[in-house]
Design a protein with these regions (language model features):
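A short alpha-helical cap/connector motif
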Residues: 1-150, 154-170, 180-226
Length: 226
């Protein structure tokens, strides 16, 4: 119940930030209108919805957020995703379903059999239990920095961000999970937004999106996605 009241309060606070009002950048307006607020029912939503019940006891986002991540991948078409903090595995599965050519590496400090079964025989998803720092460094030693990074269900978000930030490219999109989860994380999110090394950022409350195209004017977009 507390979460419902908190969301209602934040929805009111973000009321004027709905539907791209006041956004003058054509690319940002397109992203808000046709990715964030897109309502068309994608083909994969129904089978993915059926898989949710079996892993909802593990850390996860609302279904609305997982569908957003699906649309982000569908729009940007990244070739690779690195996810840190697998949680229920639902977000990785949604994003993998949006691009059949994208390879996914998802790292967690705990291995869950139900998550492994959720991924099933999908050869494009690699699910790895590891110390996160070691797993990230090993990944980067074998691969270029991926086009899409998801810092998800992990208490080590600061360390993960600091490890990956020097490796990002102008095409990289970084998804920050639950930037308002704690007072400490909220303050850190403000620092990420203000950091001169980051570019355009989007605050959707449940997730933050960070882009690194330095040819763009640095701006911060608050979007009412509650």
């Amino acid at each position: 119940m507390t979460d419902i009241f908190r969301r209602a309060w934040n929805w009111c606070c973000r009321f004027r930030h709905r539907c791209g009002y006041g956004v003058h950048s054509p690319s940002d307006f397109h992203f808000i209108t046709f990715v964030i607020y897109e309502r068309l029912p994608f083909y994969a939503y129904t089978p993915l919805h059926r898989l949710r019940r079996g892993v909802l006891h593990l850390p996860h986002y609302r279904e609305k957020v997982d569908r957003l991540l699906f649309r982000v991948v569908n729009e940007r078409r990244p070739s690779a995703l690195l996810e840190v903090g697998t949680g229920s595995g639902l977000s990785a599965l949604y994003m993998a379903s949006a691009n059949q050519q994208m390879k996914v590496r998802t790292l967690d400090q705990k291995y869950q059999e139900k998550v492994a079964r959720l991924f099933g025989e999908n050869s494009r998803i690699t699910y790895e239990k590891c110390e996160l720092k070691d797993g990230i460094e090993h990944f980067l030693s074998e691969n270029h920095c991926p086009d899409l990074i998801h810092i998800a269900h992990t208490p080590c978000y600061k360390e993960v961000f600091d490890l990956l930030l020097p490796k990002v490219k102008s095409e990289t999109c970084m998804i920050i999970g639950q930037p308002y989860a704690t007072a400490e994380k909220k303050q850190w999110w403000k620092e990420v937004v203000a950091d001169e090394r980051t570019g355009v950022t989007f605050d959707l409350y449940d997730v933050g999106l960070v882009f690194f195209d330095k040819s763009r004017v640095k701006e911060h977009r608050i979007v009412n996605f509650l």
